Amino acid sequence: MMNNAPGSPRPGPAPTPGPGPEPHTPAVHAEHLTVVRGPRTVLRDLGFTIPRGRITGLLGPSGCGKSTLMRALVGTQAKVTGTLDVLGHPAGHPTLRTRIGYVTQAPSVYDDLTVRQNLDYFAAILDPGRTAAGRRDADVTRAITDVDLTTHADALAGNLSGGQRNRVSLAVALLGSPELLVLDEPTVGLDPVLRRDLWNLFHDIATGRGATLLVSSHVMDEAERCHRLLLMRDGELLADDTPDALRTRTGAATVEEAFLRLVDEATSAARTKETTR
């Protein structure tokens, strides 16, 4: 259920997935995950797990490797080494197509189609056949309602604001009720009320529908809304813990302060290593 930008190749119907992994297994498991792009190591020896049915925040400054990590998870990133298992399969496995919803930073919608037509199109790819028409219609209507675009359902996507187009992309990702949602900066360009409403939706999807969410952001106050956090800097993982545990570990009052203290610790350790060589 990957989001594809207009003009990119379209996948055919995904094969029927086999029996899923046991419920207690993590949604994502990574060991020694590394991505090298030219002379630069973009992700360096990452190891982490993402628990099922929870919201995990992927936080760090722009350019730290968050989007690269998300592309690796959904199987679209080249030159990935190490272990990366997603929903019990290697990342990019064909059976994951309809089990993952992916929202990129750039809205993946067709400007010359209405909101509903965009969703109808993607729903037909995910759930083809005439006999599925009623199910698709209900799925599309629910997704439009989820992202609060009911009053804009018949508006051309090209006439929407940037924030509204982002919400159309999110609605596409929600089609088919995926087990894992990978959302790259989904609240960028949204006003505080819509940000709050989307985070309420994310929690409903996790707790009410049992899905797993990985949500990236460079806005540290969004960290407080997550069950668990992956904090990144310069392609490395600084922390993999709960917000409460991070504050306790660093003696900080906020996650942002905790992040800055971890950055200072990492910088100091790197300098010490350089001077002892």
What is the predicted function of each stretch?
Residues 195-208:
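Helical segment within the ABC ATPase nucleotide-binding domain
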Residues 112, 156-160:
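Conserved ABC ATPase signature
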